[in-house]
Amino acid sequence: MNPYKSPTALKSAVKARAQQQAKVTGLPISALMDRFYYQRLLARIFRHDPGGWMLKGGQALLVRFARARQSRDIDLYRPDAEAPEAALDAFRKAAALDLGDGLAFSMRGSTLLPKGQGVKLKVDVLLGSEKVHTISIDLMTNLRPLGEPERVPLEPVLPADWPDDWPDVVLYPLTDHVADKICAMYESHPPGLTPSSRFRDLADLLLIAQQNMLKATLTIAAIQSEQSRRQALGGQLDLPAAFTVPDPNTWPAGYRQAAAAVPALNGCADLEAATPLATAFMTPLLDGTARGQWNPTASQWS
């Protein structure tokens, strides 16, 4: 039961918790409050349909690594949706679930992505009558992950006795998450096929490389599958045979800024420092020579 008598009291309590947690984590108070709102929406999604969604993107990394890069989006994959409209309808029903926490999530506007890929939408977070945040949502429907999804507890970013209804969430397979980020790094975009500026994807990949084991054969297959999927949608994606940055002019400064936003990333603050790990991790995946498993302690495939 909600122990707070008014939306104002709840907001004050959330802010007080965020202030306490900011002292422990060093993260900004506003970012911690925003993550609380994201988590309350995710609680609705995975309580309404525990097996119907997979969490992708930056929010999935934050579930895996509490000190990953902060993300202002929620990316969800709906495996059984025959069309984007079906995913949107399922999301609408889940977001409307009343968990008795004084929050409401109001959809405003949605845009179908080309070629049936999914839907983009905005969701306003309401605390009483006050709009406290807006969340960007991507609902994807045409993916084909090869790895096994993971079911893990949703640990509250602001620990407290209430709310106490945190569900398990289902995470998009890590091998496919890696494949998605590698392909996003190297896909070019019109007009003029501008090189990728997805600096944050390299920072995220290096965080994964420092923290997780991965199976070589499955990860290579996932990269090839994701490359084929993007090419079928008209994307210009020619993967290099070895790690390299897409644009040597923009990537040094862009990557440095992205790496600074990942508190858990160790020793990869700039491209010069990051290149040895990026080469050890990515080149064997790109040239297909990776074998066995990735060892994050030894930083090698073996």
Predicted regions and their residues:
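Structured mid-to-C-terminal alpha-helical surface segments
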Residues: 1-53, 62-74, 78-302
